[in-house]
């Protein structure tokens, strides 16, 4: 970090080696087998990546969480109350195919294994998409993931209830197999110590929803936000490669919403994936996701093979 660079940006910038050095003496608590189970269908997640990127991040988060708990204790002492358990909320945003889910799962595993043994829940905002029938009725099936495709009132109420100390809060669950919210498939979240909220839209604010104005937003309740970033050419490549793997795997299931794609030749599949990327996911990235990047507390930038090459931490 040059002095001039540090002064001109709201972020502290670290290359991979600088960030890895901040691990200090935090022990590795995951085995190679566990790491293999955490990674996404299209990602290379190594022991080295966890040690050099995610362990320093978990150390930083542990400091923030401990500080937050001390602040809560001070408030309780001042008020003379025994406070409710209020979860620390971490949000993870970024493009489709960038690896948000893997980042979320790795952090969940690491944070739950700190000596404090905190309980960590993971929720994706996919569950808060409107059901397919609603999207069809509104002509929004090709806008899945865009702001107007979400039940934002329900998502905001979910995080608001958690931050208000409500003992049991329910979240809808999304199935990528049927490409829809699971009817009556709600998951109950019971006052975890930490909630990781992962999704395309978790950094968006009211200005991103002019069609559906309300005064509070998800980002108002988030304690620490992460944006997983990568160059657009890599994102497109990862999206297409993931589509090809799904074509040979999940799409072959007769119950899959995309079962017809399993019958495509490789060239047809590549062309289909490229079209889906350009017409839907790239458009959403440019219009609604990328503009929220600089709202994040921390930005992780990936290079080839999903390896993080740079970390920017808000001062």
Curated annotation (Swiss-Prot):
Keyword Nucleotide-binding: yes
Amino-acid positions noted as binding ATP in the UniProt annotation, renumbered to this chain: 94-101
Gene Ontology process terms (BP): coenzyme A biosynthetic process
Catalytic reactions of this protein: (R)-pantothenate + ATP = (R)-4'-phosphopantothenate + ADP + H(+)
EC number: 2.7.1.33
Gene Ontology CC terms, in alphabetical order: cytoplasm
Keyword Cytoplasm attached: yes
Gene3D superfamilies tied to this protein: P-loop containing nucleotide triphosphate hydrolases
Homology family: Belongs to the prokaryotic pantothenate kinase family.
Name of this protein: Pantothenate kinase
Lineage, opening ranks: Bacteria, Pseudomonadati, Pseudomonadota, Gammaproteobacteria, Enterobacterales
């Amino acid at each position: 970090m040059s002095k001039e660079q540090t002064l001109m940006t709201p972020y502290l910038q670290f290359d991979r080696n600088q960030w890895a050095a901040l691990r200090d003496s935090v022990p590795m608590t995951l085995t190679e087998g566990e790491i293999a189970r955490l990674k996404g269908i299209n990602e290379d997640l190594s022991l080295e990546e966890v040690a050099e990127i995610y362990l320093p991040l978990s150390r930083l988060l542990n400091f923030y969480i401990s500080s937050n708990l001390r602040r809560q204790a001070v408030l309780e002492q001042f008020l003379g109350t025994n406070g409710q358990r209020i979860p620390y909320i971490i949000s993870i945003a970024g493009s489709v195919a960038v690896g948000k889910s893997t980042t979320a799962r790795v952090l969940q595993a690491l944070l739950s294994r700190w000596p404090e043994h905190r309980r960590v829940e993971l929720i994706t905002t996919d569950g808060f998409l409107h059901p397919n029938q609603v999207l069809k009725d509104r002509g929004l099936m090709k806008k899945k993931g865009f702001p107007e495709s979400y039940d934002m009132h329900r998502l905001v109420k979910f995080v608001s209830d958690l931050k208000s100390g409500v003992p049991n809060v329910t979240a809808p669950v999304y199935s990528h197999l049927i490409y829809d919210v699971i009817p009556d498939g709600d998951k109950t979240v019971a006052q975890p110590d930490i909630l990781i909220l992962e999704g395309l839209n978790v950094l968006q604010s009211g200005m991103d929803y002019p069609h559906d104005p309300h005064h509070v937003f998800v980002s108002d309740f988030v304690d620490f936000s992460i944006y997983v970033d990568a160059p657009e050419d890599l994102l497109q490549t990862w999206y297409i490669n993931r589509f090809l793997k799904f074509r040979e795997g999940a799409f072959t299931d007769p119950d899959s919403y995309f079962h017809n794609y399993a019958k495509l030749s490789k060239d047809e599949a590549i062309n289909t994936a490229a079209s889906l990327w350009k017409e839907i996911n790239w458009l959403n990235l440019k219009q609604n996701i990328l503009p929220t990047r600089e709202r994040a507390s921390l930005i992780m930038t990936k290079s080839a093979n999903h390896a993080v090459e740079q970390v920017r931490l808000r001062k």
